[in-house]
């Protein structure tokens, strides 16, 4: 039997990540990894325990790639808007990894699309409170609602069905941002969900 090639864990994870970017997690196998590593022999998975172990390592690597995008957004002058733009950029530039993390059944019980949203919500809450002069509870509602729009746009991008340019997406996000902020500021009980939507709409259409 031919000896198995020796590669570092980092080299194997990078090779596996290349496979996933091209073929998705379902395309990851010993054969596809060998091809990505440029060898004709099966890689030695001892360091990972099994193929399941390397799949977990690839998932963790995908999370790190995603985190690098959101960290850039958090360093922008307006962090919560920067995070939204970077989230969409991640979907556009890393569609396979976006699909793995956010459009498939959870690989890790504590990490999925909603978990990612809650983590970012916590990070941007202080900035929202400071800039918009709203309460932490109102800031959470604002970010949640805007994030749902961002996630929808990102999903359209990944599925190849988004007709909007980056400029148009920026305008869409600005419009929703303004609408949500105005509702929080001017509709009593909006953030708490205790307002009367029928009364609010009647007042709006009656103007």
Report residues per predicted region.
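Amphipathic alpha-helical packing segments from all-alpha helical-bundle domains
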Residues: 108-133, 140-145, 151, 155, ...
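C-terminal peripheral helix-coil segments that are non-catalytic and often amphipathic
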Residues: 126-130, 163-207
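Helix-turn-helix
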Residues: 11, 15, 19-53, 57
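Short, hydrophobic secondary-structure boundary micro-motifs
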Residues: 29, 99-102, 110, 159, ...
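Alpha-helical DNA-contacting segments of helix-turn-helix folds
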Residues: 20, 52-62, 70, 101, ...
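Amphipathic alpha-helical linker/stalk segments
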Residues: 56, 60-83, 120-131
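Helical hydrophobic small-molecule/effector-binding pocket
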Residues: 81-103, 110-117, 147-154
């Amino acid at each position: 039997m031919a000896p198995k090639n020796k590669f570092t864990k980092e080299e194997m994870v990078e090779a596996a990540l290349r496979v996933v970017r091209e073929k998705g997690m379902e395309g990851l196998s010993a054969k596809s990894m060998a091809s990505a590593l440029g060898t004709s022999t099966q890689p030695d998975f001892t360091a990972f325990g099994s193929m399941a172990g390397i799949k977990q390592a690839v998932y963790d690597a995908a999370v790190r790639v995603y985190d690098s995008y959101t960290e850039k957004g958090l360093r922008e002058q307006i962090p919560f808007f920067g995070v939204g733009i970077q989230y969409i950029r991640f979907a556009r530039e890393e569609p396979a990894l976006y699909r793995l993390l956010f459009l498939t059944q959870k690989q890790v019980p504590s990490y999925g699309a909603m978990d990612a949203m809650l983590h970012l919500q916590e990070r941007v809450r202080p900035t929202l409170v400071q800039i918009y002069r709203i309460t932490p509870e109102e800031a959470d509602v604002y970010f949640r609602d805007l994030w749902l729009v961002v996630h929808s746009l990102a999903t359209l991008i990944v599925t190849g069905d988004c007709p909007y340019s980056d400029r148009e997406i920026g305008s869409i996000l600005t419009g929703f941002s303004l609408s949500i902020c105005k509702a929080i500021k001017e509709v009593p009980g909006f953030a708490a969900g205790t307002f009367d939507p029928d009364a609010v709409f009647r007042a709006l259409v009656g103007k």
